[in-house]
Amino acid sequence: MKKKILITGVTGFVGSHMADYILENFPNYQIYASKRYHLSRLDKIKHVYEKIKWVDCDITDPISSEKMIRFVNPNKIFHFAAESFVSPSWDHPHRYMSVNYNGTLNILEAMKKIKSNAKILIPGSGEEYGLLEKKDMPITEKTLINPVNPYAVSKVAQDYISYVYYKSFGVKAIRVRTFNHEGPRRENVFGISSYAYQIAKIEKSKSKNKNILVGHLKDKRNFTHVLDIVNAYWIATELCEVGKLYLIGNYNLKSIYTFQQALEKLKSLSKIKNLKHKIHTPFVRPTNVPFLITGKTEFEKLTGWKPKISFNQILSDTLNFWRSEV
């Protein structure tokens, strides 16, 4: 009999790649996935839709969440269902807390009730570290969090409640904070994916308007390909200690760039020359985070995991994805 994996948020960016990774590498597992009745968009997962067993669930509803956990009774849970775009969190803070915190709480409470022995991956965000200075880089497991947007606060709350359920009830929470990851299927509201999407549209339309709309360009991040990230997530559920916090990011100096540098590299990959860009006010955040860079982490020391895919390949893969979509 196959072991059972439950993926929440499988219709999204990371969740869909996680499903691909499991199907390609672990045929002894059956994937179960939650979807919000008729509301979930399935375009990112349509290529493997028939290989997944679907469960209707709204994770913000505790009764619905408990029914799902009881029905599936999984061996592993990858909990990706979340509101993840930072900018709208200032306008919709209740929504972010409802999905990211309450949704996680409902899953954990259901696991407690059925005495689940499953490991659950709780993916946090580098955004939780918030407003740090250049001298505070690289971020380590000992760096204090300083969240400065509602999204980051919701992820801190998600992480802390998972620790509470581990400590109080023995729920096997694998806690990770993941730094910037990009690649195909990333929604076109996020920096690099937004630039690539706009370039692909300009290429297709051959428009005279060659302006790419951008937000903050000076922010510096270390970037990891989503395929390296899902590999790290699987390894985390196999090797990481439950209850302990791990950071996942690409510490290689060749992975550290500003968004300005990423934009210029994408421009150089375009078939259209003389592309320009301009600041678009709605893309500018009320409070900005200039630096989010991790060094070599305890996760890498424990597992030996290292990202394999270069930053240039991240950009190429993202641009080619949008060329195939627009």
Q: For the regions a protein language model found, what residue spans apply to each?
A:
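Conserved C-terminal active-site "lid" loop/helix of NAD(P)H-dependent oxidoreductases
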Residues: V226, L245, P282-K306, S310, ...
